[in-house]
Amino acid sequence: ERLEASMNRVLGRGGGLVAMVIGMLITISVQSSSITTSILIPMAAAGVISLRNIYPVTLGANVGTTITALLAALAASGSDALTIALVHTWFNVLGIVVLYGIPFLRPLPIRCAELLAELAVRRRSLAVGWVVSVFVIIPLLVIAIFR
């Protein structure tokens, strides 16, 4: 209990800013936001860190993962590689500014994920349907519409 309280207290500092920096630093050091997220999942499942505190860590991890692309782009010749790496970075930073910076939008991703998780626990087929829709059907429809 003391460990859980301590971790949540540290991650909750600065309105989530400390958690974002921690997520970014972990991801930069391991060069993978997937590893950072994979570390957090069992902690959330065990109740060691609250979902509200894990959320800004994952946001920081998403920014941290752009460092790898920026480093690779700096090694390339020409400006195209750096341009797209900066677009990737700014996309993630602007996502934080919009979703985390506007207080009434901040809980939206967690609420949506909690709703989807509750549905998936009751009916796995809904989770599979959501994944297929988001990653296959919707992209194919967008491609077909804008061809």
Positions of the model-derived regions?
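Membrane-embedded alpha-helical segments and adjacent helix-loop junctions characteristic
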Residues: 1-30, 34-45, 111-115
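Membrane-interfacial helix-loop connectors
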Residues: 25-93
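Juxtamembrane and boundary regions of transmembrane helices in multi-pass small-molecule transporters
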Residues: 71-147
